[in-house]
């Protein structure tokens, strides 16, 4: 029964394979294997596009970052490219969607966010404590403002991860539901395929935008620690 097979649409996000060996998580190493330039004697078109994108993003991130150590921007560029490539590869049929899982996203966001927090406390803990009380706050609200600022500080990596996961999950679910709809109405197949191609193109751009948003917010958090 088709109803039984499609009863749980979220099964496509399960990190498991048919041979009872979770090989899907090895896909996270695929961008590192495919794109290193040391294996190219002559620069390929893909590497040319990647280098052009890296130069463009470096100039963009340099404006946002207030750090005097501009070399740190390379970390965020690498993170953005990794998330973008992983998001785009996950649109290929039967490819496991890594960045739809909070586990991977939380590892990326928590690691960087926590390192920024330690860096800020180590360098200037007085400034860190002063940020917990906004300027010109009433005295009777100071304790309450400290609690609010701490909560807003703690939920930052969670909001980053949930935003990325939710956008990817919603996009994949829409494509899946549209594919089920196409299989039930063969008579209007050309129109459905055109709509699905438009949604797929939109999902590709969404994957690029989400990787940019994820990285740019981390840069803003990093600039606060400086």
Swiss-Prot record:
It is found in: Mitochondrion inner membrane. The chain crosses the membrane at residues 22-42, 73-93, 102-122, 135-155, 173-193, 202-222. It comes from the Eukaryota. Gene3D superfamilies: ATP synthase, F0 complex, subunit A (1.20.120.220). Keywords: ATP synthesis, CF(0), Hydrogen ion transport, Ion transport, Membrane, Mitochondrion, Mitochondrion inner membrane, Transmembrane, Transmembrane helix, Transport. It is a multi-pass membrane protein. GO terms for cellular component: mitochondrial inner membrane; proton-transporting ATP synthase complex. Mitochondrial membrane ATP synthase (F(1)F(0) ATP synthase or Complex V) produces ATP from ADP in the presence of a proton gradient across the membrane which is generated by electron transport complexes of the respiratory chain. F-type ATPases consist of two structural domains, F(1) - containing the extramembraneous catalytic core and F(0) - containing the membrane proton channel, linked together by a central stalk and a peripheral stalk. During catalysis, ATP synthesis in the catalytic domain of F(1) is coupled via a rotary mechanism of the central stalk subunits to proton translocation. PANTHER family: ATP SYNTHASE SUBUNIT A. F-type ATPases have 2 components, CF(1) - the catalytic core - and CF(0) - the membrane proton channel. CF(1) has five subunits: alpha(3), beta(3), gamma(1), delta(1), epsilon(1). CF(0) has three main subunits: a, b and c. This is ATP synthase subunit a. It comes from Apis mellifera ligustica (Common honeybee).
């Amino acid at each position: 029964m088709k109803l039984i097979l499609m009863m749980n649409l979220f099964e496509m996000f399960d990190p498991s394979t048919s041979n009872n060996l979770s090989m899907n998580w090895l896909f996270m190493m695929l961008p590192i294997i495919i794109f290193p330039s040391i294996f190219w004697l002559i620069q390929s078109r893909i590497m040319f596009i990647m280098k052009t994108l890296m130069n463009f993003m470096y100039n963009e991130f340099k404006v946002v970052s207030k750090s005097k150590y501009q070399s740190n921007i390379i970390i965020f560029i690498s993170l953005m490219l990794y998330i973008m490539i992983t998001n785009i590869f996950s649109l290929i049929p039967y490819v496991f969607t890594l960045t739809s899982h909070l586990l991977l996203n939380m590892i990326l966001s928590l690691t960087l966010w926590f390192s920024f927090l330690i860096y800020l406390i180590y360098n200037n803990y007085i400034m860190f404590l002063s940020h917990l009380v906004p300027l010109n706050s009433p005295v009777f609200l100071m304790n309450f403002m400290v609690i609010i600022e701490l909560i807003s500080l703690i939920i930052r990596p969670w909001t980053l991860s949930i935003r990325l996961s939710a956008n990817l999950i919603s996009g994949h679910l829409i494509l899946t539901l549209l594919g089920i709809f196409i299989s039930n109405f063969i008579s209007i197949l050309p129109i459905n395929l055109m709509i699905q191609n438009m949604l797929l193109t939109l999902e590709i751009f969404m994957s690029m935008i989400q990787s940019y948003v994820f990285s740019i917010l981390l840069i803003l958090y990093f600039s606060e620690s400086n």
